[in-house]
């Protein structure tokens, strides 16, 4: 019998354009909202994607060219998420919170020739203009109105109105590069992470299956109202704009993140599903407007850093359906989600414990905890090792950096650089970054576990724990504590809080700090993560200035 393929059978490529098919069929009248400025339906979204594609094509953008975007979260960014890769070009998302020299580096390193830039960022672009010799075409994204600056080809809306729209987008290799962005690591230059059409489609489908398949808790469905509170320049806003679009969900984009504005949008647009780093949620709950904002039933995935128990307790008390997720820039990012069966898990402590874990792997993810020899450790919730993973959407390497790529994929698994354990039920808990584990007296102390304990004190607003050099023990933990406004807590109280948990067996006695530093603020990276490298430089007398 012949096994030759049928001559007319179509080898269907997994391309980003396919994500638009279902919403246009089932919910074409659903809305896309941008702050208080823009409101239109999915039919208009499709038309605008075609217009943007036509504009870019008319400006000479072709297959494989890189188009950069510098904008806050907006409908324009969503349109670029689709239009740029759908013509075969590569979408480069500029992290606008990097230093100007780093932004110039990432634009040059990515090979960007075209940029869509918000008027707010023109002073920054002007400052690095001489460092961008290959940036040939500029399109203005303008909320405020005003004249077109020199060297700009057109304003975005005017360009769309004058463009001949692309109606039928071509098929091409599903492994073609679709996006590139840059990690915000605390060492060295930013690294370029890239993803193909196939990877982004499979990531979207797996996220839909994981979030949409939940029985009740944390479930994402077509009646939700989605608003990202993770920047669209950061890991595709965790890929959720692609998911929300594919599902035909009402979407709200807030522009620049201002707490009062975010809370007002949640109330006005009845937002039901978001995601953010712990810092952002903490900031929102601390804002005076939060007390008058109904947050009951708001589903929030926390990622980018571990979900502190104290923050989870506070969110649950407000009726927020809060739960953890886990991944990294290199994993697109989704690896695990901490959803629970609320009907079978009723004990409050167990519910809190599960919600604050990293969760269980989403479909298609092969997740392991390994020792230094790549051997598996026991899934008992105790044995720890490095988290390594395989999935069809993990980056295949760092752009133009084969040495770092080889290290990332040593042994055929992607190395996350995180330490964790998996319990009998399959839930992952990340206990620390390898580089942040405090090695003291032969023991490994989790800085995250210490932070969780200290954060429970009612007078503590924020806490970060770092390891500082010690001649006797190698390293010792130093908690850096931000007090709540109007509150007071003494050093001895923090030390005794940890000591009490040590006496009850919750943490090693080696974790009890000798001193505590009270600070006004905690240094963070451009995407809101605690910058422990910088904190060590500031507070370790061996590495930096020391001080209290």
Locate the predicted segments by residue.
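Conserved AMP-binding/adenylate-forming core of the ANL superfamily
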Residues: 8, 30-74, 78-82, 99-104, ...
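Conserved pre-ATP/AMP-binding loop-to-beta segment of ANL
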Residues: 28, 162-182, 189, 215-225
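Conserved AMP-binding A3 loop
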Residues: 41-43, 178-205
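Structural core segment of the AMP-binding/adenylate-forming
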Residues: 58-59, 86-158, 485-487
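AMP-binding/adenylate-forming catalytic core of the ANL superfamily
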Residues: 98, 115-117, 274, 391, ...
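Conserved AMP-binding/adenylation subdomain of ANL enzymes
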Residues: 201-225, 233-272, 287
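Gly/Ser/Thr-rich phosphate-binding loop
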Residues: 246, 268-276, 285-353, 366, ...
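Conserved beta-loop-beta connector loops within the AMP-binding
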Residues: 364-388, 424-425, 487-491, 531
């Amino acid at each position: 019998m012949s096994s030759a393929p049928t001559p007319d059978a179509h080898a269907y490529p997994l391309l980003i354009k396919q994500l638009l098919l279902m919403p246009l069929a089932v919910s074409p009248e659903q809305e896309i909202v941008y702050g208080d400025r823009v409101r239109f339906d999915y039919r208009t979204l499709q038309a605008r994607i075609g217009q943007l594609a036509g504009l870019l094509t008319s400006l000479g953008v072709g297959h494989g060219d890189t188009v950069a975007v510098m904008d806050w979260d907006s409908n324009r960014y969503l349109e670029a998420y689709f239009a740029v890769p759908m013509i075969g070009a590569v979408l480069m998302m500029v992290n606008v919170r990097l230093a100007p020299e780093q932004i110039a580096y990432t634009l040059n390193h990515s090979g960007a020739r075209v940029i869509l830039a918000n008027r707010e960022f023109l002073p920054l672009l002007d400052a690095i203009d001489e460092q961008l010799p290959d940036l040939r075409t500029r399109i203005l994204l303008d909320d405020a109105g005003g004249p077109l600056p020199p060297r700009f080809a057109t304003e975005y809306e005017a360009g769309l109105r004058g463009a001949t729209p692309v109606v039928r987008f071509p098929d091409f290799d599903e492994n073609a590069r679709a996006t590139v962005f840059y990690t915000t690591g605390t060492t060295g230059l930013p690294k370029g992470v890239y993803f193909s059409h196939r990877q982004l489609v499979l990531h979207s489908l797996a996220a839909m299956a994981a979030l949409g398949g939940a029985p009740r808790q944390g479930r994402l469905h077509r009646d939700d109202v989605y608003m990202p509170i993770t920047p669209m320049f950061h890991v595709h806003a965790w890929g959720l704009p692609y998911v929300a679009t594919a599902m035909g969900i009402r979407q709200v984009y807030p522009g620049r993140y201002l707490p009062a504005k975010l809370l007002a949008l949640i109330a006005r647009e009845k937002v039901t599903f978001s995601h953010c780093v712990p810092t952002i949620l903490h900031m929102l709950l601390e804002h005076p407007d939060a007390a008058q904002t109904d947050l009951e039933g708001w589903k929030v995935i926390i990622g980018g850093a571990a979900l502190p128990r104290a923050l989870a307790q506070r969110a649950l008390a407000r009726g927020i359906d809060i739960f953890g997720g886990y991944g990294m820039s290199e994993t697109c990012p989704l690896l695990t989600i901490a959803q629970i069966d609320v009907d079978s898990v009723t004990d409050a402590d167990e519910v809190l414990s599960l919600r604050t874990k990293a969760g269980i792997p989403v479909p298609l993810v092969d997740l392991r905890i390994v020792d230094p020899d790549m051997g598996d450790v026991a899934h008992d919730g105790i044995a720890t090792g490095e988290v390594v993973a395989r999935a069809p959407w993990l980056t295949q390497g760092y752009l133009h950096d084969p040495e770092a790529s080889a290290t990332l994929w040593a042994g055929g698994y992607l190395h996350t650089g995180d330490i964790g354990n998996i319990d009998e039920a399959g839930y992952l808990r990340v206990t620390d970054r390898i580089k942040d584990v405090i090695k003291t007296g032969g023991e490994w102390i989790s800085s995250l576990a210490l932070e969780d304990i200290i954060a429970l004190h009612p007078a503590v607003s924020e806490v970060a724990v770092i390891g500082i050099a010690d001649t006797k023990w190698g390293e010792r933990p130093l908690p850096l504590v931000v007090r709540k406004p109007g509150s007071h807590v003494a050093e001895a109280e923090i030390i005794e809080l940890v000591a009490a948990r040590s006496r009850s067996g919750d943490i090693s006695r080696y974790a009890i700090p000798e001193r505590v530093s009270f600070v006004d603020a905690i240094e963070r990276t451009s995407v809101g993560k605690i910058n422990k490298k910088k904190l060590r430089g500031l507070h370790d007398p061996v590495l930096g200035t020391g001080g209290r």
